[in-house]
A protein has these predicted regions:
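Canonical tetratricopeptide repeat
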Residues: 77, 111, 145-149
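Terminal, low-structured helical/coil segments at or just beyond the last alpha-helical repeat
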Residues: 2-4, 29-38, 126-157
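Helix-start (N-cap) detector for alpha-helical repeat units in TPR-like alpha-solenoids
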Residues: 38, 72-73, 106-107, 139-140
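Structural marker of alpha-solenoid helical repeat scaffolds
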Residues: 67, 101, 134-138
Length: 157
């Protein structure tokens, strides 16, 4: 191998490592972090969700959804707010829509898996755990969180 070829291979390897690292470190709730900059209702809904004002967050997310019905992050956040209101049917509707829009949305797979556990459906939670195992190239927080939730659901061995 020539010196130039070796340097090129090294550069390509470093670029690949950087790409995979950025994928693994991405925030699951923000596959499009610019939506909060573009839409005041979405940003305000996220702020209310951070304060655990789930009903207020839902109202603002619904307004933002009129403008961005096909936004996976928005659907995921709506599902999370509905889940915390214990409105599981609506939570599942939005989580499924997020996954339909972005089948690799790690946050949606984690959150829907946790919602299935809250409704006693371990088998469905395990399906989303399997999806996360396929999605996460490197270990990811969403996979670990859902594994932990399933272990807690099962109880001590």
């Amino acid at each position: 191998m020539t010196r130039v070829t070796a340097q090129l291979c090294k550069a390509l390897l470093l670029a690949a490592i950087a790409t995979f690292a950025s994928i693994a470190a991405a925030d699951p709730d923000e596959t499009d972090p610019d939506l909060a900059k573009r839409d005041a209702d979405y940003a305000a809904g996220k702020a209310l969700a951070d304060k655990k004002d789930w009903a207020g967050a839902v109202l603002l997310f619904e307004r933002a959804e009129r403008r961005y019905p096909d936004h996976a992050d928005l659907q995921n956040n709506q599902g999370y707010a509905y889940r915390n209101l214990k409105q599981y049917d609506l939570a599942f509707l939005h989580y499924r829509r997020a996954i339909e829009l972005d089948p690799r949305h790690r946050g949606a797979h984690e959150y829907i898996g946790e919602a299935y556990l809250l409704t006693g459906d371990l088998a469905s939670a395990q399906r989303h755990l399997a999806a996360l195992k396929n999605i996460c190239v490197l270990p990811c927080e969403e996979l670990k969180d859902l594994e932990r939730a399933i272990a807690e659901y099962r109880g001590p061995k």
